[in-house]
C-alpha cells in the first residue's frame, strides 16, 4: 500500500476527544494561545504531535511503526476563563516515549521543540501528571524530610537559615567568620549564595575549609547540629562531583546545587551521590523566573518543582508569599504541598490540574527566602508549617548589632511563634502582639523589630489564578 504524501491537519490524527487516559500515561496541561485563525483543536493537536511522534508532513516511515501506540493525544480542551484566545489543552503521552529515570529526556520530549511552533502565539506548560510507573524509575530526593530531621535532631518547628551577604567579594576567612556568627547565634543553617562557585576572590576549597571550621566551632558551643549549604555547582559535572566528594571528606551534613543552571543530568547524578554518601542536598532555583514568570508562555514552577522531586533534592526555594519575590498564597501552597506530601488531589483553585500520587518518593522541604524579616515570622510559621526552612539573609545580617544578634532575634521570634501556635493562639490575628511580647525579653529581637517595622514589598503578584 502506498502512503498519501502531503500535509494534513494535525487534528485529524492527534485530536482524540474520545480517548480514555491510561494510568500509565504522562498527562500534561498546556495553556495554548493560538495564532489568529487557528482553531483550538488544531493548536492542541499540533502541541501533541510536535511533542511526540509528529512532524510537519506525512512521512513514509510512519508506516513502519504503530502511531496509535506511540502518538501523544490532545484529549480535552477548555477555554481559559476571562481570556478570549487562550485554552487549556490536555495532552496524554504514552509512557514508552520516555527514558526511565531521566527528567532530561522527559523535558526534551514534552517541551523541547514545540514552544517555538509558528501556529502558536504562546504556550505554557501548567502542570504534569507523572504516573506511578514512571515515578518508580526515579530515586528522588536523597533523604527526604524525616531523615533530615533525624540527622539534625530537630523536631516540631521550622528550620532557620541565612544566606551569607555580600554574596560576592568576601575572602574565605571572612566568609567563614560570618557563617560562624550566624550559627552561633541560633540559626540551623547558613547558605552559599547561588552565584558563589569558585571565583578569584574566594576559591571553593578555601571556602569549604573555613565554613567547615565555622560550623564545627558553632556546633561545639551550642550543642546543636549545624549546617552550611556548600555550593558544589561548577562548570563541569566532574568538577561538581569533586566538590561534593571534598565536602563529604570534611564531614559536613549538607551541600547545594543550582539545578536549573546546572542542568537536570548533573543534578540527578549529584542526588545519587548524596544518597550514597549521607549528604543532604539543598537546591536553589536560579534562573526559574526566566522560565516561569510569564503567565502565558513558559513552564509553571509547579512543573519545575515536580521535576526536582523526581531528579532529587532535599530542600528547594519555593517563594515566600510575604517577602520580595513572586508568589501568590494559594498557588505557592499548591506546589509546597506537591513537594512535601505523598498524595495531592486535583484542585484548580490552587492551580493543581491533576491528582498526583508520589508513591514512596521522599518529600522535599520548601525554603522560604527573599526579603523576609522578624515581623514576617508569624505569617511564615502559619503558612509553611513545621516542615520548612525559613531563610533570612538581609533579615539576619542587616541587624544593627551584627550577625549573631540578628540570628538570636530570628531564633527568639521563631520559638515565640511556635510556642504561641502550640498554645492554640491564632498567629494570623495575633502575630504582631506575639513578636512584641517576645521582644520584651530579647533586646536583640527588640532592635530587629525597630529596624524593619516599616518595610513592605507590596506589589500585585503576576502569577495569579485565572
Curated annotation (Swiss-Prot):
The modification N6-carboxylysine is found at residue 191. InterPro entries: RuBisCO, RuBisCo_large_chain_AS, RuBisCO_lsu_C, RuBisCO_lsu_C_sf, RuBisCO_lsu_fd_N, RuBisCO_lsu_N_sf, RuBisCO_lsuI. Binds 1 Mg(2+) ion per subunit. Substrate binds at residues 113, 163, 167, 285, 317, 369. Mg(2+) binds at residues 191, 193-194. Its EC number is 4.1.1.39. GO terms for molecular function: magnesium ion binding; monooxygenase activity; ribulose-bisphosphate carboxylase activity. The record marks 324 as: Transition state stabilizer. RuBisCO catalyzes two reactions: the carboxylation of D-ribulose 1,5-bisphosphate, the primary event in carbon dioxide fixation, as well as the oxidative fragmentation of the pentose substrate in the photorespiration process. Both reactions occur simultaneously and in competition at the same active site. The basic functional RuBisCO is composed of a large chain homodimer in a 'head-to-tail' conformation. In form I RuBisCO this homodimer is arranged in a barrel-like tetramer with the small subunits forming a tetrameric 'cap' on each end of the 'barrel'. This is Ribulose bisphosphate carboxylase large chain. It comes from Proboscidea louisianica (Louisiana Devil's-claw).
Amino acid at each position: 500500500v502506498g502512503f498519501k504524501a502531503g500535509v494534513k491537519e494535525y487534528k485529524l490524527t492527534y485530536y482524540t476527544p474520545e480517548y480514555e487516559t491510561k494510568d500509565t500515561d504522562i498527562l500534561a496541561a498546556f495553556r495554548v494561545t493560538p495564532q489568529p485563525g487557528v482553531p483550538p483543536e488544531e493548536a492542541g493537536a499540533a502541541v501533541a504531535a510536535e511533542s511526540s511522534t509528529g512532524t510537519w508532513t506525512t512521512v513514509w516511515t510512519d508506516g513502519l511503526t504503530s502511531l496509535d501506540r506511540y502518538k501523544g493525544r490532545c484529549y480535552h480542551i477548555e477555554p481559559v476563563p476571562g481570556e478570549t484566545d487562550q485554552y487549556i489543552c490536555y495532552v496524554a503521552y504514552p509512557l514508552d516515549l520516555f527514558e526511565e529515570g531521566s527528567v532530561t529526556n522527559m523535558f526534551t520530549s514534552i517541551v523541547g521543540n514545540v514552544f517555538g511552533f509558528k501556529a502558536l502565539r504562546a504556550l505554557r506548560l501548567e502542570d504534569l501528571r507523572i504516573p506511578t510507573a514512571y515515578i518508580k524509575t526515579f530515586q528522588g530526593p536523597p533523604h527526604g524530610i524525616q531523615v533530615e530531621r533525624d540527622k539534625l535532631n530537630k523536631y516540631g518547628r521550622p528550620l532557620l537559615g541565612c544566606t551569607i551577604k555580600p554574596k560576592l567579594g568576601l575572602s574565605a576567612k571572612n566568609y567563614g567568620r560570618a557563617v560562624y556568627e550566624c550559627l552561633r547565634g541560633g540559626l540551623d543553617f547558613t547558605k552559599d549564595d547561588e552565584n558563589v562557585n569558585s571565583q578569584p576572590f574566594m576559591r571553593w576549597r578555601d571556602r569549604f575549609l573555613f565554613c567547615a571550621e565555622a560550623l564545627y566551632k558553632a556546633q561545639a558551643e551550642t550543642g546543636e547540629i549545624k549546617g552550611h549549604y556548600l555550593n558544589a555547582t561548577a562548570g563541569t559535572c566532574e568538577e561538581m562531583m569533586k566538590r561534593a566528594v571534598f565536602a563529604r571528606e570534611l564531614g559536613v551534613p549538607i551541600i547545594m546545587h543550582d539545578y536549573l543552571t546546572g542542568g537536570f543530568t548533573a543534578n540527578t547524578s549529584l542526588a545519587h551521590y548524596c544518597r550514597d554518601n549521607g549528604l543532604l542536598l539543598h537546591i536553589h532555583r536560579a534562573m526559574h523566573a526566566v522560565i516561569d514568570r510569564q503567565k502565558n508562555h513558559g513552564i509553571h514552577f509547579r512543573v519545575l518543582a515536580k521535576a526536582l522531586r523526581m531528579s532529587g533534592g532535599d530542600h528547594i526555594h519555593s517563594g515566600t508569599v510575604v517577602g520580595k519575590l513572586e508568589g501568590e498564597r494559594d498557588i505557592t501552597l499548591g506546589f509546597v504541598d506537591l513537594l512535601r506530601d505523598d498524595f495531592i488531589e486535583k484542585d484548580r483553585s490552587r492551580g493543581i490540574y491533576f491528582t498526583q500520587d508520589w508513591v514512596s518518593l521522599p518529600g522535599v522541604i520548601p525554603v522560604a527566602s527573599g526579603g523576609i524579616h522578624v515581623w514576617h515570622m508569624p505569617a511564615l510559621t502559619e503558612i509553611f508549617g513545621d516542615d520548612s526552612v525559613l531563610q533570612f539573609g538581609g533579615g539576619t545580617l542587616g541587624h544593627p548589632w551584627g550577625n549573631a544578634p540578628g540570628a538570636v532575634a530570628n531564633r527568639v521570634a521563631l520559638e515565640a511563634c511556635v510556642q504561641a501556635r502550640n498554645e492554640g493562639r491564632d498567629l494570623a490575628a495575633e502575630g504582631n502582639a506575639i513578636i512584641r511580647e517576645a521582644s520584651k525579653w530579647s533586646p536583640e529581637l527588640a532592635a530587629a523589630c525597630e529596624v524593619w517595622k516599616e518595610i513592605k514589598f507590596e506589589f500585585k503578584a503576576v502569577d495569579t489564578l485565572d
